[in-house]
Regions:
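Conserved small/polar residues in nucleotide/adenosyl-binding loops
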Residues: 196-197
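Membrane-proximal helix-loop-helix units in multi-pass membrane proteins
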Residues: 96-145
Length: 198
């Protein structure tokens, strides 16, 4: 029963993070670094954001396998379930929220603040269950172990966040001709979420 409760709390955490993503998308002030690449790819391909999140997260798992090789545990494949669940919740919350957005720049800042709150709350929920890490965190840990063994985990996370954002920016200008989904919120979100965990 306790394990079932942990799964329910874990899924609730993913749902609230996804809800935060939906609010950040509607604010049009930029999504978090984790979701920046899936967002840009979704705009390029015209596919649902949730679908792109799932595919790219599975790509992160494949990179983990290449980096860790035999050190990659079969249990870590559970991240695939996380990828599908989170992708589903992203599409669900986008549907629930629709095109809702508070008017004006101040209203959009409020939307971004709500997004940050939901993301922080969701992360707290799923971390407390000590179940499956999301693929981006798994990739950070894998890179910390194999590529940057002398750096702290948070330093590797910053490197990875910056890398995916830069890739997203390049793809934006190459395929869209303008910057989309990467703005001030892309910087504010990780900083603010980290602060809420202090």
């Amino acid at each position: 029963m306790k394990f079932v409760k942990r799964i329910v709390i874990y899924l609730a955490g993913l749902f609230f993070v996804a809800l935060g993503v939906a609010f950040s998308v509607n604010s049009n002030l930029g999504v978090s670094p984790v979701n920046s690449l899936p967002y840009v790819v979704s705009r390029i391909l015209g596919k649902d954001l949730g679908t792109c999140v799932t595919v790219i997260f599975i790509g992160y798992i494949l990179i983990q396998i290449l980096l860790l090789r035999k050190a990659f545990r079969p249990l870590d494949l559970a991240q695939i379930l996380c990828s599908f669940a989170f992708g589903y919740f992203v599409d669900l919350t986008e549907t629930l929220l629709g095109s809702f957005c508070l008017p004006g720049y101040p209203g959009r800042l409020v939307m971004l603040a709500i997004s940050i709150f939901f993301v922080a709350f969701g992360i707290c929920l799923y971390l407390d269950t000590d179940l499956i890490v999301i693929p981006m965190e798994g990739l950070t840990a894998a890179m910390n172990k194999t590529v940057f063994p002398k750096k702290a985990f948070h330093e590797v996370k910053v490197i990875l966040d910056c890398t995916v954002v830069v890739v997203g920016i390049v793809l934006c200008f190459v395929f869209l001709g303008e910057l989309q989904g990467i703005r001030e919120g892309t910087v504010l979100c990780p900083c603010s979420v980290s602060y809420t965990h202090l």
